[in-house]
A protein has these predicted regions:
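Secretory targeting and sorting signals
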Residues: 1-30
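C-terminal region of N-terminal signal peptides and the immediate post-cleavage residues
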Residues: 20-43, 47
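Active-site-adjacent pocket scaffolds in enzyme catalytic domains
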Residues: 46-62, 135-151, 217-331, 382-390, ...
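Active-site beta->alpha N-cap acidic-glycine motif
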Residues: 55-170, 177-181, 211-244, 260-261, ...
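C-terminal domain-boundary segment and adjacent tail
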Residues: 61-66, 70-71, 253-265, 320-425
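Generic structural signal for well-ordered alpha-helices
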Residues: 102-106, 157-162, 194-205, 243, ...
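Aromatic- and acid-rich polysaccharide-binding/catalytic face
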Residues: 169, 173-174, 273-276
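Active-site cleft segment of glycoside hydrolase catalytic domains centered on the general acid/base Glu
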Residues: 182-200
Length: 425
């Protein structure tokens, strides 16, 4: 990938220390191949989706190929049932470059039966020579703080996106030029400017074959106008106006804010599935659940002291696992984790993420899903049940147990009919 050096502006959040922010009824246990997950209740993989005729869209960059396979069917919680533990692993600016991290983590996801969300930067499908097709809000045409791509980088990224979706993963957006700060950054954009940015992100996905001259490549197997339902803003800036724009455009969730580990709620009709404050082992403060934030609090640079690489990676892994444990053994709030395909500090954070996936996704009653699947499950629940779940503080299970806490028959729930709790289709 021929992108320029990625500049990630930072904001701040006060905990015990200032933590800098990155620029960036049940879906319960799936029928994993991992032996450690045996005993998870009721999850079965459905038969593969029937093959559908491919219907090209536009210039053939995308196509309708039928419903996405491999997704868990959401089921409403039964009275007194303990919620499953959801974990979402997500990636900002997803693209395949010489590091081959996109393809690597697709393999990791398959190994541990974890589907993820890949937030694509639209300019990664736009070649340098066509840069002027991008007209960013409050900047001149052809400007991008993360550069553009070359033909091989576009080809490689498209192939990974295609395979990722076919594996059951989600393709969201990280928008385009990644502008942060006070000089035309996304935090200064109006609702209409956000709509323009979203429209252009869609356009680059829907026209990469023409723009990159890759007519021989197979299309992306989805209609991006329907696939795109959520995003994370650059540097976690500009969320207020973005959510307003996204609500008008039919998005279903946003993950650009800062939350504690409690059950999510909606904001202007969108699920707020933001990153969360998690422990930093050995320190008296918490930081955001993202590789960049651990890096800032450890080395403050992407090229720190090599003698500390292993310790820093272990610290991030252990912090994420501690966050998982307090949810899993507590209020069961979904754990939201964000990352970048980067080799900061010798790649120690990529190791940390992989080891976290291997640790948590194989546990009983745990489902590692994309944001889309989490939103589907939340939408399937009784609103009163979700309201009760939101009363549980970080790490706190119901005092008298789940059976008593959620004993009330949810409105519209089936009577005594036994319902399968999760199915893959």
């Amino acid at each position: 990938m021929k992108a320029a050096t990625r500049r990630i502006a930072v904001g701040v959040v006060a905990t015990a220390l200032i933590a800098e922010l990155v620029g960036c009824s049940v879906l319960d246990a799936a029928d994993n191949s991992a032996a450690a997950k045996q005993g998870a209740p009721g999850a079965k993989k459905g038969a593969p989706a029937p093959k559908s005729a491919v219907r090209l869209i536009g210039d053939g960059s995308t196509a309708f190929t039928g419903p996405q396979s491999g997704l868990l069917k959401p089921r409403r919680l039964k009275p007194g049932q303990q919620p499953p533990q959801f974990v979402v692993f997500s990636w900002d600016g997803a693209g395949e470059d010489s590091q081959k991290l996109f393809s690597h983590f697709r393999k990791v996801g398959k190994k541990y039966d974890a589907t993820m969300t890949y937030f694509l930067s639209g300019v990664y499908l736009l070649p340098e020579e066509k840069a002027n097709l991008y007209d960013p809000p409050q900047h001149s045409p052809g400007r991008s703080d993360i550069g553009f791509n070359d033909t091989q980088g576009i080809r490689d990224t498209v192939r990974q996106l295609r395979g990722a979706w076919q594996d059951g993963n989600e393709v969201g957006t990280h928008f385009n030029g990644h502008f942060c700060g006070n000089e035309g950054g996304v935090g200064q954009w109006s609702v209409d400017e956000w709509k323009s940015e979203i429209s252009q992100a869609r356009s680059f996905v829907k026209n990469w074959r023409t723009n990159a001259g890759l007519e021989g490549e197979q299309p992306l197997p989805f209609d991006y106008d329907k696939e795109l339902i959520g995003a994370r803003t650059p540097c976690l800036e500009g969320r207020t106006n973005f959510v307003r724009a996204a609500a008008e455009l039919g998005f279903r969730y946003d993950t650009s804010g800062i939350n504690d580990q409690i059950w999510p709620k909606k904001d202007l009709g969108l699920w707020d599935l933001s990153l969360q404050m998690v422990p930093v082992p050995g320190r008296a403060f918490e930081t955001l659940s993202m590789d960049y934030n651990f890096m800032v609090n450890q080395s403050g640079t992407v090229k720190g002291d090599p003698s500390k690489f292993e310790y820093w990676g272990n610290q991030m892994r252990d912090g994420l696992v501690k966050a998982f444990d307090r949810a899993y053994n507590g209020n069961r709030a979904p754990l939201i984790i964000g990352n970048h395909f980067e080799s900061w500090n010798g790649g120690t954070y990529m190791r940390a993420v992989e080891e976290t996936i291997a640790t948590v996704c194989v546990k009983r009653d745990v489902t590692c899903v994309s944001f889309r699947q989490l939103a589907d499950w939340l939408d399937a629940q009784d609103p009163e049940v979700l309201r009760k779940l939101r009363t549980l503080p970080v790490g706190q299970a119901p005092r008298n147990g789940w059976a008593a806490f959620l004993a009330t028959q949810p409105a519209g729930a089936p009577g005594s009919t036994k319902v399968k709790q999760a199915e893959r289709h």
